[in-house]
């Protein structure tokens, strides 16, 4: 409040809103046909490396995301198990001016013109790209 008194608490903050461990989350995601994709591993807070102190060998992730593409060589050197994985660079922007310039992109196939849902088609294509 205006006097800096606590007026309530939030028990399920987004960063800890699950009781699944890493293996269970990976298995569940895979079971539903998704890709478990560690995000912004190079961020100093909440990235898998900051939380665990390492990029684990298991579960076997097919891809990962960097917040800053300039950190790629450093992370490959520190964690050789990242070397042959797909990766994307994403700014994790929450403001328009923080969006990257488009120099990092993923090429996906053109959606068919047969009435297929474009968003469903692109979602599936992106999952396949990250999986392989």
List PLM regions with ranges:
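Phosphate-interacting basic helix/loop segments used at nucleotide- and nucleic-acid interfaces
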Residues: 18-29
